A protein has these predicted regions:
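A conserved beta-strand-loop-helix scaffold within acyl/acetyltransferase catalytic domains
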Residues: 36-83
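Conserved active-site alpha-helix within GNAT-family acetyltransferase domains
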Residues: 118-135
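Helix-loop element at the rim of GNAT/NAT acetyltransferase active sites that forms part
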Residues: 26-38
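Acyl-donor-binding surface of acyltransferase catalytic domains
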Residues: 1-14, 139-141
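Conserved GNAT acetyl-CoA-binding A-motif
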Residues: 105-117
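Conserved acetyl-CoA-binding loop-helix of GNAT-fold acetyltransferases
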Residues: 80-86, 90-107, 123-127
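A short beta-loop-alpha structural element at the N-terminal edge
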Residues: 13-27
């Protein structure tokens, strides 16, 4: 990720809030509305927040977009759970959440990394400065 100047454009966006444990129910509701996501448990969301962090945008009293990290180390963090409710897409909400998350990670000298299989999401990541370093395949047994 190199395009730090683009990331700074969104840095002061007050719509983006940090996910707290009290918001887990609303996060679960968002997951239920995004077909591309597997449905997590409350416990798995809690565990994810213990090993990472997340940011969200709330509209109409519901969380409509989010981006999270997990498996943070002293040098890297995996970006996960980037998604937006279908009724609120194409408004830049996921981008704002990713930017907030990445800015915080970069300020802590951590490199954000991610996997994606959605080409539309890939376009956002590339626009933000992520670079492809390889491809991955999942084999099922």
């Amino acid at each position: 990720m190199k395009n730090r100047s683009y990331l700074k454009e969104y840095e002061l966006d007050s719509d983006v809030k940090k996910i707290r444990f009290g918001k887990i129910g609303k996060i679960l509701s968002l997951y239920e509305n995004i077909n591309e996501f597997q449905k997590p448990t409350i416990q798995s969301i809690r565990e994810n927040l213990r090993t990472g962090r997340g940011y969200y945008i709330e509209k109409d009293k519901k969380i409509v977009s989010m981006a999270k990290s997990t498996a943070e180390s002293t040098t890297h963090a995996m970006i996960v759970g980037v998604g937006t409710h279908p009724m609120y897409r194409n408004k830049g909400y996921a981008t704002k959440c990713i930017v907030k998350l990445c800015n915080n990670l970069i300020n802590e000298k951590k490199k954000p990394c991610l996997f994606y299989d959605n080409e539309d999401a890939g376009k956002i990541y590339k626009k933000l400065g992520f670079k492809e370093v390889g491809q991955w395949v999942i084999y099922y047994v």
